[in-house]
């Protein structure tokens, strides 16, 4: 279950974790996540429902947005540039952070984010997750990447770059890792150089 965004003690708990992370990792960037949040239990939570009524919220997405806003401001107070998954983008009240776009089944999302003036990093699920089974189609999609017409309305100057990732829960050893990552990483590198 996700953390309850309506209890003050949960904010204190998360902030204490952030404090520890900031001490350990000196990067100027701090990614707060906020993806794939299962919100069904917030619909049933009396504390969440009470907060929604007090704040005039219509949807539980607004609870996540509130949580992201508070955590974003907290992390910024630590002198960090804040990043979060595009799941955290709520169009009517976007947060001032760098969005990491992964949900490629929402092709309008990069346009919505960048038109509001927010920076974005592309990390599309189907294209830039190098843990997918290697295929000619996968390589082709990397080599043939174009912003348009796939991402309507995108403001290219707000695209900071691209990021590839590998989730290793289905990759049992180094040999298999190499098969997944190469030559996709070369294609990804070329794509990144061409489009930025």
What are these regions (language model features)?
Residues 194-196:
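Conserved small/polar residues in nucleotide/adenosyl-binding loops
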Residues 77-80, 116-120, 187-192:
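Structural alpha-beta junctions
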Residues 30-32, 82-84, 99-101, 120-123, ...:
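Hydrophobic faces of well-ordered beta-strands that scaffold small-molecule active sites
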Residues 154-182, 186-190:
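Catalytic grooves of carbohydrate-active enzymes
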Residues 48, 100-102, 138-140:
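Short, hinge-like loop/turn segments at secondary-structure boundaries
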Residues 107-166:
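Aromatic-lined glycan-binding groove of carbohydrate-active enzymes
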Residues 41-46, 93-95, 130-139, 174-178:
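Histidine/acidic-residue-rich catalytic or RNA/ligand-binding cores of hydrolases
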Residues 2-95, 104-105, 110:
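Active-site neighborhood of glycoside hydrolase catalytic domains
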């Amino acid at each position: 279950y996700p953390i309850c965004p309506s209890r003050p003690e949960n904010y204190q708990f998360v902030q204490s974790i952030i404090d520890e992370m900031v001490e350990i990792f000196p990067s100027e960037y701090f990614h707060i996540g906020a993806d794939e949040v299962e919100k069904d239990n917030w619909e049933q939570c009396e504390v969440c429902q009470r907060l929604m009524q007090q704040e005039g919220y219509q949807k539980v997405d607004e609870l996540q947005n509130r949580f992201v806003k508070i955590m974003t401001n907290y992390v910024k107070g630590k002198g960090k540039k804040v990043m979060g998954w595009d799941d955290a983008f709520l169009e009517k009240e976007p947060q001032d952070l760098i969005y990491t776009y992964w949900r490629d089944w929402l092709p309008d999302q990069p346009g919505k984010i960048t038109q509001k003036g927010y920076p974005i990093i592309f990390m599309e699920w189907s294209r830039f997750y190098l843990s997918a089974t290697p295929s000619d189609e996968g390589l082709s999609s990397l080599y043939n990447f174009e912003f348009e017409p796939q991402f309507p309305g995108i403001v290219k100057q707000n695209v900071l770059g691209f990021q590839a990732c590998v989730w290793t829960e289905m990759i049992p050893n180094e040999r298999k890792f190499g098969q997944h990552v190469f030559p996709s990483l070369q294609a990804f590198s070329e794509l990144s150089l061409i489009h930025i």
